[in-house]
Amino acid sequence: MQSIIEIDLHGKNRYQAKVAIDAALRRARPDVMRLRIIHGCNNGTALRDMVREEYAGHPKVRRLESRLGNGVTDLVLREF
């Protein structure tokens, strides 16, 4: 069964958000196929932009998918 890990970034700054995402990528089990990053869109785009810029070329990330009116970005992971 494929799993999804959700990470809610509300209330976090860019540094805290990156630390949380990096930790989730490091500890993701082989059955985890997506990290669902909930960054919101009503209070600016800094977190959304950081997620999309930092992780678009990450070696563990196959592609990014936008969800829910740009308030959520899924990191679709590569199989390792």
What do the predicted segments below correspond to?
Residues 1-80:
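Long, charged, low-complexity intrinsically disordered regions
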